[in-house]
Amino acid sequence: MSGVSALFLPPASTAGADGELAVWWVQDGECRRAPFAQALAEIRAPWRLYLPVEAVTACAVNLPTQKARWLRQSLPFAVEEQLADDVEQMHLALGPALADGRHRVFAVQRTWLAAWLALAEGAGKAPASLHVDADCLPGEGSCLFWLEERWLLGGSGAVRLACGSEDWPVLRDSCPPPQRAFAAQEVAPLEGVEVQALAGNPHVWLSEQPLGTDLAQAEFAARQQSSQWRRWRPLLGLVGLWLVLQWGFTLVQAWQLQREGDRYAAQSAELYRQLFPEDRKLINLRAQFDQHLADSASSGGEGQLLGLLGQAATVIGGEPTVSVEQLDFSAARGDVALQVRAPGFDVLERLRSRLSESGLAVQLGSASRDGSTVSARLVIGG
């Protein structure tokens, strides 16, 4: 059990959750006493919370089924007659099977337990497990342990309770042998029971014993798990925010690329209509343009014209601010003269450079400014 801290709620905790209530807590083999809120601030995770047996009803019942999926559903009906309180108000935890086939069951007020856990969760220190102090006593038979001015009674039998020395003669005959007791040397021994003296701190000793049933079951099991995840919420929130931003950026980028593609397609279609005004229906620009090239491949000057235009169309279509106002073809010289208009001289120069890089012979004639645009004669081929 080393490495796991432990916090013990005293019998007075049955009055209700109180951050100022003094509790004992064990860490690194040392026991300290402090208000519950202060202990939470100092305790190191993971840690176990020990409930006083006074807050818990322990009983042993016969369950109608051994199938795990039905056991929890049958618990309220099996223990209802053994509880003084309304079973609907109780949190039920299923323990191990006893030698006689019955199952140990623990019942604790749901609102009481939830209130103490809420204090721990509010401090960001939810316990890793929940145990009953009297359920963690070792050995076969009956085991008694002196803690906080009362005897805890546990062991391999069904009984889990706290009692005074004066109650032992009444309980002794119903407790299975062997009967053992552990206490500090100054504690008065019980009648008929050999008490083994403890030299160390009793809370440290109890925290080192094998654990009993973990009461963090059903809705409280989910509560403990959610508390463990709560520490990761800030990081998960950042990851989620990053994913949302990345998704939004991708959508915006796709939308922009779609718009850019639509714009290029519209410019290519406009250029095609200028070159082939007789084609009134434009269904597949690339296929129709290739068809014109194929039809006129052997038709002399027209084939040469279409060949030059086929090479230049992609480059010119990539400059959305450039428009072709006039086209002149000279079969004798083997060139195409385009009268183009652009918003500036730099755009014309960029167009000339791109045409040259595509393998075309290009000459840019003198350009003149007309208002906010520039007009120039562009000769391709020759």
From Swiss-Prot:
The chain crosses the membrane at residues 234-254. Keywords: Cell inner membrane, Cell membrane, Membrane, Protein transport, Transmembrane, Transmembrane helix, Transport. Gene3D superfamilies: 3.30.420.380, General secretion pathway protein M, EpsM. One of its GO terms (biological process) is protein secretion by the type II secretion system. InterPro entries: ATPase_NBD (IPR043129), GspL_cyto_dom (IPR024230), GspL_pp_dom (IPR025691), T2SS_protein-GspL (IPR007812). The keyword Cell membrane applies. Disruption phenotype: Absence of XcpY results in decreased amount of XcpZ in type II secretion system complexes. Residues 255-382 are periplasmic. The keyword Ligase does not apply. Residues 1-233 are cytoplasmic. GO terms for cellular component: Gram-negative-bacterium-type cell wall; plasma membrane; type II protein secretion system complex. It is found in: Cell inner membrane. Coiled coil: none annotated. It is a single-pass membrane protein. Its main location: membrane. Type II secretion system is composed of four main components: the outer membrane complex, the inner membrane complex, the cytoplasmic secretion ATPase and the periplasm-spanning pseudopilus. Forms homodimers. Interacts with XcpZ/GspM. Interacts with XcpR/GspE and XcpS/GspF. Inner membrane component of the type II secretion system required for the energy-dependent secretion of extracellular factors such as proteases and toxins from the periplasm. Plays a role in the complex assembly and recruits XcpZ resulting in a stable complex in the inner membrane. Provides thus a link between the energy-providing XcpR protein in the cytoplasm and the rest of the T2SS machinery. Belongs to the GSP L family. This is Type II secretion system protein L.
